[in-house]
Amino acid sequence: MTIRSPEPEVKIVVEKDPVKTSFEKWAKPGHFSRTLAKGPSTTTWIWNLHADAHDFDSHTNDLEEVSRKVFSAHFGQLAIIFIWLSGMYFHGARFSNYEAWLGDPTHIKPSAQVVWPIVGQEILNGDVGGGFQGIQITSGFFQIWRASGITSELQLYSTAIGGLIFAALMLFAGWFHYHKAAPKLVWFQDVESMLNHHLAGLLGLGSLAWAGHQVHVSLPINELLDAGIDPKEIPLPHEFILNRDLLAQLFPSFAKGLTPFFTLNWSEYSDFLTFRGGLNPVTGGLWLTDTAHHHLAIAVVFLVAGHMYRTNWGIGHSIKEILEAHKGPFTGEGHKGLYEILTTSWHAQLALNLAMLGSLTIIVAHHMYSMPPYPYLAIDYSTQLSLFTHHMWIGGFTIVGAAAHAAIFMVRDYDPTSQYNNLLDRVLRHRDAIISHLNWACIFLGFHSFGLYIHNDTMSALGRPEDMFSDTAIQLQPIFAQWVQNTHVLAPNLTAPNATASTSLTWGGGDLVAVGGKVALLPISLGTADFLVHHIHAFTIHVTVLILLKGVLFARSSRLIPDKANLGFRFPCDGPGRGGTCQVSAWDHVFLGLFWMYNAISVVIFHFSWKMQSDVWGSLSNQGVVTHITGGNFAQSSITINGWLRDFLWAQAAQVIQSYGSSLSAYGLLFLGAHFVWAFSLMFLFSGRGYWQELIESIVWAHNKLKVAPAIQPRALSIVQGRAVGVAHYLLGGIATTWAFFLARIIAVG
């Protein structure tokens, strides 16, 4: 008799028709909360409605129901993204000069928005070249369309329609997977299956599909565009896909088909899968054959990774086992218990994902200029500045969000009884040592980095330039950064013998790429000025981390308030009769962290903007002489606070301040308006709730006198609401001011 192991049964992981689709319910504001569903009696109701609408934890304690709501909301988010993308492509098709730009990208600027002539607003349509009047755009869409092989506005229309179809699909999926077939909790907690599918499906097959598109569509079309062929003469994408001979004319190895692949002569394919390094001198972008090779390699890596985790077949890794085996000699129980946290707390999961995504976004910001991936991106200075700034802000916000959700996890989901002597418990137990050391590091960095500037300002004021820290007096060279640069310059000869240039021209080595007389990229030398400002970066980043980490580590308890966990994530003070306990909630740490994040990112984007204008961006004469936009003044001017104020903020604000009467005038108005929004925030941040309540009561008295009193009783914002409104306007005003300042400047001079 043979004993067979039981066949693994297919688990039913969805529930049919769990929640009725009800339009009556949707039409009732606050239907998710018994208190809010009663309707407003005071004006606080509308604030609570906004605060709690997406706080699914407050609607129900059922983890499965919360998971389904989050899952469904993700489809809604994707639908919005597809609609937004579709709108971008539609603007490119309907209102843009894309085809003209494609024919002459060095002289014509990208525009995809034309302002209607209402009361003189046609002034906003500037001349972007080729007889086209419109607003110059700085999003980089034209460059990415060129790289993907889009040659006509019809193709943009088609893609826009495709985007809308996908948006509709996503909206349907969001409804279907909540109301018709909702996954059970076990499905959300099946991490191995999720890893396999996300790694192999999204990243693996996604990269493979993109690599395929690049090889069969982008490469041939870009090859012909680079050779100066008129876009209208170039075959359509499907012709390259269906007709191999067309491709073989450009890349001879296509004639051999798949033979080299199966005979392992992969080097035959090196005409379209290259490893060159550096930039294409025609477009100033990375070699598209390099990026196709890159995406193919990424696809292979992730397809392998997507087969590593144990599911129905009993082979492969188990995440729980990996975590529990992860112990060191000094780390107690190690990662034991973390698996349970990450499968039952979506806040913990989100915190990790936000921290990693934010860091990745900041890495993207730095690679977009140093390794410009799309054709003609590097000579479009306005777009370069916009993309860097955008990715830095996004990364900053995302990292603060990581701390916010880590703190929410600590307050709502952390169970101290199941976390004994593992790494999380050990970190929490020596949090005082961590925070006090970090605080010391912040004080040290703050005094020393700022002190170097103050020294320079003082010596400058006393007329003693020889006693300043500068490249021409007392040098503080960033020797470690220079060493890193140098090793990368040597890499092509040593570690990558087939590469013709290093990964980025910024490392050094003397190569300069200019396109149409404009510098695309050249070696960036670092000196005393960079050393000084990098220590300001270190200071602001450490203070941001100090505030956020303190908020997380002290979210549940502190010496001041031992029972903080009972008060929740956000609360104004620990009740009456306990003075000095205000602004200690985890939420308040996020609130304060946002201001320091704003400080940190502001210094970074100011540094980038000035450094690039001074040392990289500019024009190349026929004699080979480079003239930079601000003539290399960064090294000597940015070493004093006064230099930053005078030669960066004031000197470069000339364009936005004098923009009236030109096509940049909208930026002048934005600059003023955003300053106003920023100042408006101070009214919320510097004023107490009682002041407003008193004012409101006297205004209500006047309304009563006139018998026009409202049915909904007006109330001053709560302390937390006031701070939330304050920080929102502070950041919006500050970011929009910077945006207007940057764009008016760089569009005028770039």
Swiss-Prot record:
What the protein does? PsaA and PsaB bind P700, the primary electron donor of photosystem I (PSI), as well as the electron acceptors A0, A1 and FX. PSI is a plastocyanin-ferredoxin oxidoreductase, converting photonic excitation into a charge separation, which transfers an electron from the donor P700 chlorophyll pair to the spectroscopically characterized acceptors A0, A1, FX, FA and FB in turn. Oxidized P700 is reduced on the lumenal side of the thylakoid membrane by plastocyanin.
Name where it's found. Answer: Plastid, Chloroplast thylakoid membrane
List positions binding chlorophyll a'.
H675
Membrane-spanning parts: 70-93, 156-179, 195-219, 291-309, 346-369, 385-411, 433-455, 531-549, 589-610, 664-686, 724-744
Q: How does it sit in the membrane?
A: Multi-pass membrane protein
- Molecular-function GO terms, alphabetical: 4 iron, 4 sulfur cluster binding; chlorophyll binding; electron transfer activity; magnesium ion binding; oxidoreductase activity
Residues binding chlorophyll a are: M683, Y691
Judged by the first EC level, this protein's enzyme class is oxidoreductase
> Cofactor: bound how, per the entry note?
P700 is a chlorophyll a/chlorophyll a' dimer, A0 is one or more chlorophyll a, A1 is one or both phylloquinones and FX is a shared 4Fe-4S iron-sulfur center.
UniProt keyword annotation of 4Fe-4S present: yes
Family annotation (NCBIfam families) = psaA (TIGR01335)
- Can you name the source organism? Anthoceros angustus
Q: What is this protein called?
A: Photosystem I P700 chlorophyll a apoprotein A1
Keywords attached to this entry: 4Fe-4S, Chlorophyll, Chloroplast, Chromophore, Electron transport, Iron, Iron-sulfur, Magnesium, Membrane, Metal-binding, Oxidoreductase, Photosynthesis, Photosystem I, Plastid, Thylakoid, Transmembrane, Transmembrane helix, Transport
- Entry keyword annotation includes Membrane: yes
UniProt binding sites for phylloquinone: W692
Q: What is its EC number?
A: 1.97.1.12
Where [4Fe-4S] cluster binds, per the record, is at: C573, C582
GO biological process terms held by the UniProt record? photosynthesis
User: What are the annotated GO cellular component locations?
Assistant: chloroplast thylakoid membrane; photosystem I
